């Protein structure tokens, strides 16, 4: 495993992951309109899942001897629920790419396989959230 490259990739993913936590929380608490109220609770659940994954990234960065970033990817907010979904979809795409990129430096030893497997689970969970957002977007 290229530890320095791994830490760098994980920190980039963490910056985006932290943004995801906050953006889902913002959408959850701010959506208006009857047609969006059903999504508010789901967005809160997504925020909680994003926080759990952010913690896992911090744990892995620390275990590898790195320091977790305190930087946060550019955060956005809009009171327009449809535009908020669009923004989440775009930003989650960026985060998915960063998580995928973090797999590259993992290598083939047991510890690195565990990192790769964890990242794949995060990608799968996040992609399911994006699928939900896309379905919600099409229904609005």
Predicted regions mapped to residue ranges:
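Iron-associated oxidoreductase/ferritin-like identity signal
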Residues: 1-140
């Amino acid at each position: 495993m290229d530890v320095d490259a791994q830490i760098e990739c994980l920190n980039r993913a963490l910056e985006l992951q932290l943004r995801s936590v906050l953006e889902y929380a913002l959408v959850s608490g701010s959506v208006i309109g009857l047609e969006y109220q059903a999504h508010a609770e789901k967005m809160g659940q997504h925020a909680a899942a994003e926080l759990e994954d952010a913690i896992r990234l911090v744990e892995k960065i620390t275990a590898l001897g790195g320091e977790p970033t305190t930087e946060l990817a550019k955060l956005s907010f809009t009171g327009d629920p449809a535009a908020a979904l669009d923004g989440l979809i775009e930003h989650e795409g960026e985060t998915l790419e960063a998580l995928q990129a973090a797999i590259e430096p993992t290598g083939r030893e047991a510890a690195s396989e565990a990192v790769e497997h964890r990242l794949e689970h995060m990608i799968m969970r996040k992609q399911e959230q994006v699928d939900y957002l896309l379905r919600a977007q099409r229904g609005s």
